[in-house]
Regions:
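Catalytic helix-loop patch of NAD(P)-dependent Rossmann-fold dehydrogenases
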Residues: 1-6, 12, 18-19, 27-71, ...
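Residue-level signal for the nucleotide or nucleotide-sugar donor/cofactor binding architecture
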Residues: 2, 46, 82, 86, ...
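Active-site beta-alpha turn of Rossmann-fold NAD(P)-dependent dehydrogenases/reductases
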Residues: 21-25, 45, 73-75, 110-113, ...
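NAD(P)-dependent short-chain dehydrogenase/reductase
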Residues: 34-35, 57-116, 121-130, 148, ...
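Mid/C-terminal beta-alpha module of Rossmann-like enzyme folds, strongest
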Residues: 91, 134-175
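Core catalytic loop region at the nicotinamide-binding pocket of NAD(P)H-dependent oxidoreductases
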Residues: 102-107, 128-143, 166-168, 217-219
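Conserved C-terminal active-site "lid" loop/helix of NAD(P)H-dependent oxidoreductases
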Residues: 121, 140, 153, 172-201, ...
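Amphipathic terminal alpha-helices
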Residues: 202-219
């Protein structure tokens, strides 16, 4: 948050005519059992969500004055190169290590019942580019696919791409006490106003993510 503050203050002091994009998160919203649009009530329930909301508030203060600030609110994005602290990248990295006998054939997971709106990170970056070019300053935009996937199905899809037999173990340490059961976005605004749509099929994203980790493990 302080880094965002210092950056915006520096840009303002230098009187630069520039557009600034502050990557936000769907975790600024209150939990919902339906698809979330940008007018859904704000109410983060995690420290991370609070920090992203604080960044937005700093940015909006500047957007109300002289700077052009863009506010994407990304739902779950994934893809090759993502840190294995995230669920799908963790699944893929564990499978890759099992394939090379680096670890026993057991995948440790958190909740597999959660439903998540998943967007390929490459589509997410394309959304950021489009917003920098055509987005309205101070206006939030959901970056999402509009489709929810159960994490158990995502894991099953990854396992279908390997020949190894794997056991799945629920690791209590990976369960998050304040995790939302459903996190689904409504992309209508960014679709209509910016012309951006999530294009990459989940199967392609999962394949590329698993192949990325196969390459990493073999190094």
């Amino acid at each position: 948050v302080r880094g965002t503050q210092f950056l915006l203050e520096a840009i303002s002091s230098a009187r630069l005519s520039t557009r600034v994009l502050i990557p936000g998160s769907a975790l600024v919203y209150q939990p919902s059992t339906d698809a979330i649009a940008e007018d859904h009530p704000i109410g983060p329930v995690s420290p991370y969500g609070l920090s992203k909301l604080a960044q937005e508030m700093l940015g909006k203060k500047c957007a109300d004055s002289e700077l052009a600030i863009l506010f994407p609110r990304s739902f779950t994005h994934l893809g090759p190169g993502q840190n294995p602290s995230y669920a799908v990248s963790s699944f893929a990295s564990q499978i890759a290590k099992i394939e090379t006998n680096e670890t026993p054939p057991v995948i440790r997971v958190g909740s597999l019942e959660a439903l998540r709106d998943l967007t390929d990170v490459r589509d997410t970056v394309d959304a950021y580019r489009a917003l920098m070019a055509r987005g309205v300053s101070g206006r939030p935009y959901n970056v999402c696919s509009g489709h929810a996937h159960r994490m158990s199905d995502v894991l099953e899809a990854l396992l279908s791409q390997t020949d190894v037999d794997v056991a799945v173990h629920i690791d209590q340490k990976r369960l998050r006490p304040k995790d939302n059961d459903l996190l689904l976005g409504d992309p209508s605004r960014i679709n209509a106003e910016i012309g951006w749509y999530a294009k990459t099929e989940l199967e392609e994203t999962l394949r590329d993510t698993l192949n990325y980790w196969r390459d990493v493990v073999r190094l």
